[in-house]
């Protein structure tokens, strides 16, 4: 669980503050937690993300952002919805949410995506990401998930944009993080069978956690890093 929430933070810090290393992200932790609270996340989720980042960066309770319980109570609506739900409904935008969780595209990439960006390479479908890509880095994303859904949706759009508008309330960063975690799990080999050179060993508080380097690299490429 901590890994998932830390991935959310790292993806956000890379895209908004252009961090180049994990350590560079530490100074943005409190900004992230304050933003997450204002987005209307539950007290439980904010606390969970706080604990995850405190562990990741060895941050003391004196340094970490203190959640504003009164503010959080005020933003909860009587029927249990969050304030951000006024502006965005996953149910009403289920195709967008499903697409994001299956492709990991950035907001700017989604805004520029057209039906004709669905291509074939050696008989296999890919999404060609060229417009809106960060740093102008072109990449082709294989359809690892929801292949029929994505092909059907994009093919139906022709030269038109796949999504006319990306709502501001859509939490694209979290969908990217979900995609990253999902793709890593799909690609990762049995860690016990890998030679030392193909393993990534975490340090400090995450010491003991070990990941498949090859799978991590493929996920990074798919995300456009």
Annotated model-derived regions:
Residues 45, 49, 92-93, 172, ...:
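Hydrophobic (often cysteine-bearing) scaffold residues that line and stabilize catalytic clefts
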Residues 79, 112-149:
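Conserved tyrosine-mediated DNA breakage-rejoining catalytic core shared by Y-recombinases
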Residues 166-216, 225:
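Short basic/aromatic active-site micro-motif
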Residues 133-179:
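C-terminal catalytic core of Y-nucleophile DNA break-rejoin enzymes
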Residues 41, 63-90, 134-145, 158:
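DNA breakage-rejoining catalytic core of tyrosine-based enzymes
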Residues 108-113, 219:
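Alpha-helix N-cap/helix-start motif at helix boundaries, enriched for small hydrophobics
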Residues 1-72:
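N-terminal core-binding DNA-recognition domain of tyrosine recombinases/integrases
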Residues 77-107, 210-216:
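Basic, Lys/Arg- and aromatic-enriched nucleic-acid-binding interface segment
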């Amino acid at each position: 669980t901590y890994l998932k929430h830390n991935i959310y933070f790292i993806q956000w810090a890379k895209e908004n503050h252009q961090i180049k290393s994990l350590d560079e992200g530490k100074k943005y932790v409190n900004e992230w937690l304050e933003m997450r609270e204002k987005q209307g996340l539950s007290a439980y989720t904010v606390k969970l993300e706080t604990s995850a980042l405190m562990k990741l960066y060895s941050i003391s309770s004196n340094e970490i952002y203190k959640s504003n319980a009164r503010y959080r109570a005020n933003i909860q609506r009587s029927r249990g919805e969050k304030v951000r739900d006024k502006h965005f409904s996953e149910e009403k935008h289920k195709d967008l949410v499903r697409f994001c969780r299956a492709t990991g595209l950035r907001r700017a990439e989604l805004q520029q995506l057209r039906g004709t960006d669905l291509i074939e390479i050696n008989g296999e479908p890919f999404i060609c990401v060229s417009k809106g890509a960060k740093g102008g880095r072109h990449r082709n994303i294989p359809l690892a998930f929801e292949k029929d859904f994505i092909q059907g949706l994009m093919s139906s759009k022709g030269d038109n944009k796949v999504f006319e508008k990306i709502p501001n309330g859509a939490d694209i960063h979290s969908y990217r993080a979900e995609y990253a975690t999902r793709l890593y799990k799909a690609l990762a080999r049995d860690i016990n069978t890998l030679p030392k050179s193909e393993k990534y060993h975490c340090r400090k508080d995450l010491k003991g956690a070990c990941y498949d380097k090859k799978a991590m690299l493929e996920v990074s490429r798919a995300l456009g890093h």
